[in-house]
Amino acid sequence: MANALKEKYVNEVQPALIEKFNFTSPMQAPKIDKIVLNMGVGDAVSNSKNLDEAVEELKLIAGQQPVITKAKKSIAGFRLREGMSIGTKVTLRGARMYEFLDKLINISLPRVRDFRGVSSKAFDGRGNYTLGIREQLIFPEIDFDQVNRVRGLDIVVVTTAQNDEEGRELLTLLGMPFAK
């Protein structure tokens, strides 16, 4: 079963991008490469149970097993030692990536309180888009009663676009609700 968002990309978005940017080959049209979800759990330093909860929540959100990230440097002010587990991340590609993006755009983002669209300024100069979510409760897989603590997460949409203009156009055509 092909994903609706993938079909939309192939049938509508890719031809529109080729026409707008005058590409000579369909392979030049930007596409989504991967989506990385990252959840920093700074309080895992004092209580490792918090990290286990974050891993479980990210597993439910992404539908795939996350990896635990470790501290690169020791920082005395944060009581942090090099190699301590301080976060979790998961990289989505292929069908799961399109399913997640579809779910994010159509279900999760509209559930954000006072939602007026996502910032159109969060591009990195190379066509990749970063989005911060303040609470994991906007995802339908997370059960409100099971959550001990509200945590945020970062979502990075990595594209093959050469610049921000191409990346913004790609995400706009896919349905990302940018603020006006």
Curated annotation (Swiss-Prot):
The keyword Ion transport does not apply. The keyword rRNA-binding applies. SUPFAM superfamilies: RL5-like. PROSITE patterns: RIBOSOMAL_L5. Coiled coil: none annotated. One of its GO terms (molecular function) is tRNA binding. This is one of the proteins that bind and probably mediate the attachment of the 5S RNA into the large ribosomal subunit, where it forms part of the central protuberance. In the 70S ribosome it contacts protein S13 of the 30S subunit (bridge B1b), connecting the 2 subunits; this bridge is implicated in subunit movement. Contacts the P site tRNA; the 5S rRNA and some of its associated proteins might help stabilize positioning of ribosome-bound tRNAs. PANTHER family: 60S RIBOSOMAL PROTEIN L11-RELATED. This is Large ribosomal subunit protein uL5. It comes from Leuconostoc citreum (strain KM20). The gene is rplE.
